[in-house]
Amino acid sequence: MSTRGLGNRLATWFAALAAIALLLPLAGCLPTPRPASSTTPSATASKGPILVVASVNQWGTLAQEIGGDDVKVTTILNSTNVDAHDFEPKTSDIAEIQKAQVVVTNGAGYDSWASKSIAKSTVSVSAASTVGAISGDNPHLWFSKDARKAMATELADTFSKILPSKKKSFDKRLKTWQSEESDLEDAMAAFAKKHRNTTYAATEAVAYYLMSDMKLKDVTPQGYLQSVTSGGEAAPADLQEFQELLESDKAKLLVDNPQESSDSAALLKKTATANKVPVIEITEQMPSDQHTLTGWISSLVETMTKQVAAAQTDEKDSSNDTSDGTATDANTQDASPSPSSASQSASDPSSSTSPSSAQ
């Protein structure tokens, strides 16, 4: 699964759009990026509301925000207790997909059960197609700010073509959403500025894009990551390396996906807790107490901001306590050591403070 490769393609995609925008005044008509939707929306024009089916609630809530009262959204997968990768749709789910005017999917192999059920006359809007993701890339695209922005725009355009009389309404909702998303990006930028070079590790790469947008550094052992990405259990040596990472305070956060539980993940969470490393639970599907995609991710950013700040405060307090203890011990010694003893201390490595005690 290539996470960094897709990140580079996302940046390239948006750069290409900017370049096209600059060149349009100079050239009459230039080719546009590959559309994210299939079937011509105008061919299915209606008086509304538009019947929309989303494979997962992350994209379903976004479709509802952009569409408002002018769409009727049905979401197939709403529960955090179900793994979308292995989800088996019921006959009624397939029927919903096939009667929809617009089907919203994630793509990149995440919800192929929905993609392969779409009727030829149905307009398909895929997050993966929108940003150029392919099977094998990290499929958790809703955690990417670039993917969210691209999908919001694509949905507004698609709905406007099907229901042109409501285009102003769709555009207005899109602008409202963009304002909220901008606030989220500001919060992520503030975190990145205040907590530079903060590290994290993950039991599963569910939130890779989110952590990347927040400028956190992924220090998850590669051997472990490759094992879980391929669907296997981590080798004992890789698991031990991960535990040592947490025990040595090299990861300031541990991200866990409770929808992908395993004995290895349970052990790593236990190790993190024992070493006072904050554990952040991030599910794939939106929890039932969240109602919008941006709102959910904003709450995750807020939680991580508080957890990191609290951990840094504890670390600082611990460091101060250690320093105070060292000062007290020093005061019991001769306040004026002889030059010879000072020289001996400087040349003797064993007399210096260890990295662990200095932290």
Q: Which stretches of residues belong to each language-model region?
A:
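Extracytoplasmic metal-acquisition and chelation regions
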Residues: S2-A18, P25-Q359
